[in-house]
Amino acid sequence: MSLQDNFKYKEYWRKAGLKKYYGQIFVDLVKQQNPKNFLEIGVFTGVTARNVCELLYLINNKDFFYLGIDLFEDFHEAISNEVVPEFLVKKQNFSNPLKSFVYNFLLKEKLNSLDSVSKFLKKFQNNVELKKGNSLNILSQTDLKIFDMIFVDGGHSYETVKFELDIILKNIKDNCLVVCDDYSLQEATGVKKAIDESVRENSFNFKVVANRFACLSKK
């Protein structure tokens, strides 16, 4: 069994968008796709990015590329009807009081800032590019055909997800896998609506994994 087959998702000592159970399911999807070039929309604190880069390194050694797009600390610039994570709204309110003390008082570090995420991914700095800004602007200027896998987990409004998928699904290569998070999230029903419409309009293969991850690929 290879090292990548044995790879286990780690939450590290940060705030993770994916907890261990769903994180492992996600990295198993990455293993199945076996990508070299990876795009993530919605980096948050970089935990998923770090796991992806660790896995890409096992698969490709130093020959891989990760691109992450996020508003980072400028999340307040999102469109007015956007769904913002409670963790950001409450100014890094950790459930773990020790984490709160260390990050908010001792280090004074905003985990979703570009600087913090860059430091967290420094191990792979030659393979990683982080772009700060609105995905609606950045995607249209990005060559999406280079990516083998795209993880969509940024804005959760219908408008944002639909716009992102309109660009992505029309510009990816044939064997690219697009995975959208939070397909069944009740607090953001616009995600499911946008995905369902995009699948119908583009006639893509579609399946939902673990009642959470919507997987799209060309027929």
List PLM regions with ranges.
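A short alpha-helical cap/connector motif
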Residues: 1-219
